[in-house]
Amino acid sequence: MVKLGNNFAEKGTKQPLLEDGFDTIPLMTPLDVNQLQFPPPDKVVVKTKTEYEPDRKKGKARPPQIAEFTVSITEGVTERFKVSVLVLFALAFLTCVVFLVVYKVYKYDRACPDGFVLKNTQCIPEGLESYYAEQDSSAREKFYTVINHYNLAKQSITRSVSPWMSVLSEEKLSEQETEAAEKSA
């Protein structure tokens, strides 16, 4: 263990170990300035580009020539075609993003407030759930029910006569009479 409260001013002198079992090692040692930076070199050599050029001319330290093998799928293709393909890919990506957003909107799990129940993508009060359960059926059945009601209504309702129907029918009769008179004459 280390005994706290050592005096740093006595850095050169070592205190003997005390009998109480504590070491007298200081927790922090003073910083020596000579450790911070190295002495500057006596001579600095800076090589310029002209000193490197002779090595290159002599053939020393040249990397070996490696044949390049590249395959380009865009070689021989016009810039207009490249831009067109890029635009098509961008439009396809944006279309996918739009379809994903639309799908998430329609399939979004909606949470209803307290006292309401989600029924056919609508929040309805719990008290009216039994009423909606009686009407609940598939879309095809609803379609046929509507058509049957329409046919029954069409058959059961007598044809209503508009006040204009009598005027129109009289005009047709008068036209037919004039045509018949013209043919006979």
UniProtKB/Swiss-Prot annotation:
Signal peptide: none
Domain of life: Eukaryota
Residue ranges, Cytoplasmic side: 1-82
Residues covered by region (Required for GRIP1 interaction): 129-164
Protein's cellular compartments: Membrane; Golgi apparatus, trans-Golgi network membrane; Endosome membrane; Cell projection, Dendrite
Alphabetical GO biological process terms: amyloid precursor protein metabolic process; apoptotic process; clathrin coat assembly; endosomal transport; neurotransmitter receptor cycle; neurotransmitter receptor transport, endosome to postsynaptic membrane; positive regulation of receptor recycling; postsynaptic neurotransmitter receptor cycle
Induction behaviour: Up-regulated by TP53 after DNA damage. Up-regulated by genotoxic stress.
Claim: tRNA processing is one of the keywords in the record: no
GO cellular component: cytoplasm; dendrite; early endosome membrane; endoplasmic reticulum; endoplasmic reticulum membrane; endosome; glutamatergic synapse; Golgi cisterna membrane
A single GO molecular function term of this UniProt record: ionotropic glutamate receptor binding
Lumenal compartment residues: 104-185
Main localization, broad class: membrane
Key word Nucleus present: no
Entry keyword set: Cell projection, Cytoplasmic vesicle, Endoplasmic reticulum, Endosome, Golgi apparatus, Lysosome, Membrane, Signal-anchor, Transmembrane, Transmembrane helix
Pfam families per the UniProt record, alphabetical: Calcyon
Bilayer topology annotation: Single-pass type II membrane protein
TM region positions: 83-103
Known role: Plays a role in the recycling mechanism in neurons of multiple receptors, including AMPAR, APP and L1CAM and acts at the level of early endosomes to promote sorting of receptors toward a recycling pathway. Regulates sorting and recycling of GRIA2 through interaction with GRIP1 and then contributes to the regulation of synaptic transmission and plasticity by affecting the recycling and targeting of AMPA receptors to the synapse. Is required for faithful sorting of L1CAM to axons by facilitating trafficking from somatodendritic early endosome or the recycling endosome.
Family indicated by similarity: Belongs to the NSG family.
Assembly and binders: Forms a complex with GRIP1, GRIA2 and STX12 through direct interaction with GRIP1; controls the intracellular fate of AMPAR and the endosomal sorting of the GRIA2 subunit toward recycling and membrane targeting. Interacts with STX12. Interacts with APP; could regulate APP processing. Interacts with FAM171A1.
Protein name: Neuronal vesicle trafficking-associated protein 1
Organism whose genome encodes this protein: Homo sapiens
